[in-house]
Amino acid sequence: MARPLKVGLDYFPLDVNIDDDVELLEAECGLEGFAILIKLWQKIYATGYFIEWNDDIELLFSRKINADKNTVNSVINACLRRNLFDNELFQKYGILTSRGIQKRYITA
């Protein structure tokens, strides 16, 4: 009998010397912004290396993590500005991902 295919990752690396863009996100959005980013990474890596993002998903995600929808939206916009997520792919396909996310997924 074939082994079932694994979807997503059980863990992802979080460097102790975090990227300056993440530090800037935390400076801009506070610890809540940092926590939202980590929760987004968890959601992404749980299923692969990107997630679709739209108003309904944002509403469900906000409810799940008990955060204000406007705060989540503000953090995502800051992540897009700071290239923590690829803005071009977000605008074109409505997905949250980045080269770094994809690289970590492939090497994990």
Task: Show the residue positions of the predicted features.
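Short recognition helix of helix-turn-helix/winged-helix DNA-binding domains
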Residues: 1-48
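Winged-helix/helix-turn-helix nucleic-acid-interaction surface
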Residues: 1-13, 20, 59, 63-108
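Short, low-complexity, polar/charged sequence segments that are solvent-exposed and flexible
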Residues: 30-35, 56-58, 106-107
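Short acidic, hydrophobic short linear motifs in intrinsically disordered regions
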Residues: 48-63
